[in-house]
A protein has these predicted regions:
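N-terminal edge beta-strand
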Residues: 36-63, 157-180
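Short edge beta-strand/loop segments characteristic of extracellular beta-sandwich folds
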Residues: 55, 67-76, 182-188, 198-203
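Aromatic sugar-binding surface patches on proteins
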Residues: 103-111, 229-238
Length: 272
């Protein structure tokens, strides 16, 4: 009996090591080189410290709605512009969260949205400039379970709000004559990830999400998004851009079931 008692701590230690080694191996594995190959066809990556900024909380309060802000850091005198920004959440089931194409004349300098984060992970922002070069910045986020977290609304409520859009403009500190604008688009949509479970049937809810969004001022492109399952429920984009004097702001969204949602709004002049 004494021999068995003595062996128990040793067995516990060995079991602890057995379970710890796979966890440590997973932690040590860096998926980023493979993602560069798969998403960017192994194109060279330059340090984006002076080109593209990414801001996220180090420890997320809610892994299903983690705020992220992407910001241009190009100097005003730089003749180049950011053509697109790809957001990659390295350890998510579908790492490419979104790709944003920026209108050539819109001068979009900042984009904020909300994403799901499934594991402790690096998150990369890759900017492609008008000269064809890629620049990358990253942050580390502590969050888990965001892709499988239950929806915030029940299925009936989500269906009733499907495709409903809201547009907001925000006052800025620039002089009234400034053409810089700040706006927000919100779309009612469950954006199901395919990893969430129906609490009644205990079956997985099929993936169903906004995969395309186009924003224009009159007919001039401001911003478009190719989205995936990592974009949170009820997609929400807040962004800055330069007005071309358009009177109408338009949005068109498509989802993976083929629905098309459109809306447009009057553009308020600064100070009104």
């Amino acid at each position: 009996m004494t021999g068995c008692t003595r062996r128990l701590p040793l067995i516990a230690l060995l079991l602890g090591i057995a379970f710890a080694v796979p966890a440590q191996a997973e932690e040590a594995y860096d998926p980023w080189p493979g993602l560069v190959q798969n998403i960017f066809s192994s194109r060279p990556m330059n340090d984006g410290g002076n080109v593209i900024g990414i801001e996220m909380p180090y420890r997320a309060e809610d892994a299903a709605i983690v705020p992220v802000t992407l910001r241009s850091k190009l100097s005003p005198g730089d003749a180049r512009r950011i053509r697109s920004i790809t957001l990659v959440i390295d350890r998510n089931p579908a790492p490419m969260a979104a790709k944003f194409e920026l209108g050539p004349d819109a001068n979009v300098t900042e984009i904020s949205t909300r994403v799901r984060v499934n594991n402790y992970t690096d998150v990369h922002a890759v900017a492609e400039l008008s000269d064809g070069q890629l620049y990358v910045s990253k942050v580390y986020v502590k969050a888990s379970g965001g892709c499988s977290a239950p929806a915030g609304k029940n299925a009936e409520e989500a269906q009733n709000r499907l495709g409903q859009m809201r547009y907001r403009q925000f006052a800025r500190e620039e002089a009234p004559a400034s053409r810089m604008r700040e706006a927000q688009i919100m779309i009612g949509h469950p954006n199901n990830s395919g990893l969430q479970m129906d609490q009644v049937t205990q079956l997985y809810i099929p993936a169903f999400f906004i995969n395309q969004l186009k924003l224009t001022q009159d007919d001039s492109p401001v911003l478009s998004m190719e989205g995936g399952i990592s974009i949170s429920e009820d997609p929400n984009l807040r962004f800055t851009y330069v007005s071309n004097g358009a009177r109408r702001f338009r949005a068109e969204a498509k989802d993976t079931d083929g629905h098309v949602f459109r809306n447009e709004w009057d553009v308020e002049k600064p100070g009104t």
